[in-house]
From Swiss-Prot:
Function: Plays an olfactory role that is not restricted to pheromone sensitivity.
Membrane topology designation: Multi-pass membrane protein
This protein's name: Sensory neuron membrane protein 1
Keyword match DNA-binding: no
Pfam families hit by this protein: CD36
Family statement: Belongs to the CD36 family.
Expression sites (tissue/organ): Detected in both male and female antennal tissues. Expression is two to three fold higher in male compared to female antenna.
Length: 527
């Protein structure tokens, strides 16, 4: 039996609709997910691998310095008064070198290299980097703190060494140009032959003090970031490529061949999370992210905050903080013991950086209120000083990121050294940094073309085909039953008429039917 043409068309439309439903709601999500798994893994010759190896645009690296305005009063025990100066803006270019793939366990090893370029045009109004700031002498205060903690009897000798190395300083503060402190370096005179200066300089060289380079004629040079600029980091990092399981992409599993640190206690020595440059796809609001910071020797676990958008792309915002080590059981292993944790919002970096510094959020945001009371001139603001990352959830791409951290030190007070015997003994800020990322138009367009435009096209087509199928289904049903409905309507047997006989009175005469009232005559209307 041959199908009639209208019925064929209807069935064809129904087939198109069925295809739209199967492809749009079943097959396409599977295909998209499979393709994303391939693209997001760190396999060779993919766009993600290329960007992971060398980020093709500069990150924003901003430094904010704290200038101390009441040095004489601080030396007598007064609370510090600070004024923030910044930002000093640097373009930061990041790349990975000495890259090796290991197919057998789906890992990749690499070293890091960063370059920094000062940008006065992007810095704060009028800032050139040649501004002189007054702040606690990080090197002197660090050495005094370490000696006080380990060999307090040696503080007197250290004071004599300071007189030789730093030319008899009148206080524990330094007056220094910003770029000298950050990158160019300040000279430490270790050419003195007296016992105390020579002993201290020998110890500095032997220990390889953080941020120190050694030049001819016993001249040392100290800076905060100079050793990182253009220098290959010696540490070898091992991460998962994510080819076998894309949810493991970028996950740190070893540094220098060691599968855990030997810095903290217990679980805090574990490497948890990615290396911070790549994240797994298919993020949901319930997912807790993890990334490991080798600068701070710890993992961070940002949590979902709210829905956001960036350049027309829907994103999820995740935020993080330093934490409350004393009251969070998961963080107590960062302390020497649970009863020796720093105040809320502070992290002791001595074991990690070999320097008696503390990390916090800028301006002591989300920290113990006492920290703000001990320093004047700080104004914490969640928008300006928090850690936040906006992710595109399907691909796991960070669209916007602002990672901020402040470095602090205790103004050590001890009677065993005249230079610091009257200091307030409180925590005080030194500087804070912001490392920022915002994908430019080129990479946003690339993401849209590869992910969102195909997704939208399929979304339109699947609904269009589903609509065509519905119309075809209705049309086929109408056509199929049209003849039966017409025949049913025109058939004599389909319309039965019931005969109504007039009511007969007692005289066998039909009753009259009254229309209005009791009279056949219309009522008279008075005018």
């Amino acid at each position: 039996m041959q199908l009639q043409k209208p019925l064929k068309i209807g069935l064809g439309m129904m087939g198109a609709g069925l295809f739209g439903i199967i492809f749009g709601w079943v097959l396409f999500p599977v295909i998209l997910k499979s393709q994303l798994k391939k693209e997001m893994a760190l396999s060779k010759k993919t766009d993600v691998r290329a960007m992971w190896e060398k980020i093709p645009f500069a990150l924003d690296f901003k430094v904010y310095m704290f200038n101390y305005t009441n040095v004489e009063e601080i030396m007598k025990g007064a609370a510090p008064i600070v004024k923030e100066i910044g930002p000093f803006h640097f373009d930061e270019w990041k790349e990975k070198v000495d890259i090796e793939d290991h197919d057998e366990d789906d890992t990749i090893t690499y070293k890091k290299r960063d370059y920094f370029y000062f940008r006065p045009d992007k810095s704060g109004p009028g800032l050139t980097g040649e501004e002189v700031v007054v702040m606690p002498h990080l090197l002197m205060l660090s050495m005094a703190t370490i000696v006080n903690n380990e060999k307090p009897a040696m503080l007197n000798m250290l004071g004599k060494a300071f007189n030789g190395i730093f030319d008899e300083p009148k206080d524990i503060f330094i007056r220094v140009k910003v770029l000298d402190l950050l990158f160019r370096g300040i000279i430490i005179n270790c050419a003195r032959t007296e016992f105390a200066p020579k002993a201290v300089c020998t110890a500095l060289k032997k220990e390889g003090a953080t941020g120190m380079t050694f030049e001819p004629n016993n001249q040392f040079r100290f800076s905060l970031f100079g050793m990182r600029n253009g220098t290959i980091d010696p540490h070898v990092v091992t991460v998962r490529r994510g080819i076998k399981n894309v949810m493991d992409v970028g996950k740190v599993i070893a540094i220098d061949g060691k599968t855990e640190q030997d810095v903290w206690r217990d679980k805090c020595n574990e490497f948890e999370g990615t290396d911070g440059t790549v994240f797994p796809p298919f993020l949901t609001e319930k997912d807790n992210l993890e990334s490991f910071s080798d600068d701070l020797c710890r993992s961070f676990k940002p949590w979902y905050q709210k829905k956001t958008s960036y350049r027309g792309i829907k994103t999820n915002r995740y935020v993080a903080n330093i934490g409350d080590f004393a009251n969070d059981p998961e963080l107590q292993c960062y302390c020497d013991s649970p009863d020796k944790c720093p105040p809320k919002g502070l992290m002791d970096l001595m074991k990690c950086m070999k320097a008696p510094m503390y990390a916090s959020l800028p301006h002591y945001l989300d920290s113990d209120p006492q920290l703000l009371k001990d320093v004047k001139g700080l104004s914490p603001d969640a928008n300006e000083h928090g850690i936040e990352i906006d992710f595109e959830p399907i691909s796991g791409t960070p669209m916007v990121a602002k990672q901020r951290v402040q470095f602090n030190i205790i103004l050590l007070k001890t009677d065993k050294m005249d230079l610091i015997k009257d200091l307030p003994g409180t925590m005080t800020p030194l500087f804070w940094i912001e490392e920022g990322l915002a994908l430019n138009k080129t990479f946003v367009k690339m993401l849209k073309n590869q992910l969102f435009i195909p997704k939208r096209i399929v979304s339109v087509v699947k609904w269009l085909l589903a609509g065509v199928g519905f119309v075809g289904l209705v049309g086929s049903l109408v056509y199929q039953f049209k003849g039966k409905m017409i025949n049913f309507a025109l058939s004599p047997s389909s319309a039965q008429v019931t005969k109504v006989n007039p009511e007969i009175n007692q005289q066998n005469q039909p009753k009259d039917i009254s229309i209005i009232g009791e009279s056949q005559n219309p009522p008279k209307v008075d005018m």
